[in-house]
């Protein structure tokens, strides 16, 4: 098992009881110790606009704690989210067929599905996308007034007026983003799950894994 983790600044977003980074840490811990109980080698790769850390697959409880400590200690990385460098690194470094969990919000300006790198990785390995989402990313708050939004990665900010038209337009952008990702995952092909940070992320992940066993 290889867990590839997005550690860009957008993963720091948290408007519910957990940030996306906290949610992915819980998910990572669950995957690590599940793999350990099944006596499966496990490793991790951390990335933002480049690969920032790599721990090759090993089978030891101490390695699980090392991975979690290194993950939690990683400061938010500057720059935009770019998945292709991580995908290329995984293709190069993983010699044996591996289950790869690609954990990212996929908030990126690059077309990760263009160029075929992800399809090449998925042809050799079992790749599963895990997409954590904060409630603030899926809908604007109710009520009237003005809301200032800031991109955690670029630092750009803008103020919008809260009204029904703005909520409808925002909802349409979210739907288009979901549709684009879903269609891309289908073309690769690869399994995926959108996990909300205001819900039990482990239960959501277990639902995905259980559905894979039934397939």
Language model regions located:
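Exposed, interaction-prone extracellular/peripheral surfaces
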Residues: 1-29, 33-215
